[in-house]
């Protein structure tokens, strides 16, 4: 919970260590940045990408934080900041023929979302 200035009140939510490439999640996040809460929900629910699910969970969490901690109405919220950072990369090996092993990289990412409401 952050209060900046007189009229902007912000609530934040985070998702860490999501097993997905940050590049793929940024493609989704760029579509909802700066939009209203309800508009972002519509966009995320109808996009056909797997990365929409964790972003949708973070958006629900940020809206719940704004309602519970700050007493804001969900219809008055807008997304002020969304950030996707790279997390640690899990390194695995895939066994191959003749005793070889091919490396597999499993990237992770951290999603941070901030919603603001005007009181």
Swiss-Prot record:
It comes from the Eukaryota. This is Large ribosomal subunit protein uL22c. PROSITE patterns: RIBOSOMAL_L22 (PS00464). One of its GO terms (biological process) is translation. Keywords: Chloroplast, Plastid, Ribonucleoprotein, Ribosomal protein, RNA-binding, rRNA-binding. This protein binds specifically to 23S rRNA. Part of the 50S ribosomal subunit. GO terms for cellular component: chloroplast; large ribosomal subunit. Gene3D superfamilies: Ribosomal protein L22/L17. Transmembrane segments: none annotated. One of its GO terms (molecular function) is rRNA binding. InterPro entries: Ribosomal_uL22, Ribosomal_uL22_bac/chlpt-type, Ribosomal_uL22_bac/org-type, Ribosomal_uL22_CS, Ribosomal_uL22_sf. Belongs to the universal ribosomal protein uL22 family. It is found in: Plastid, Chloroplast. Pfam families: Ribosomal_L22.
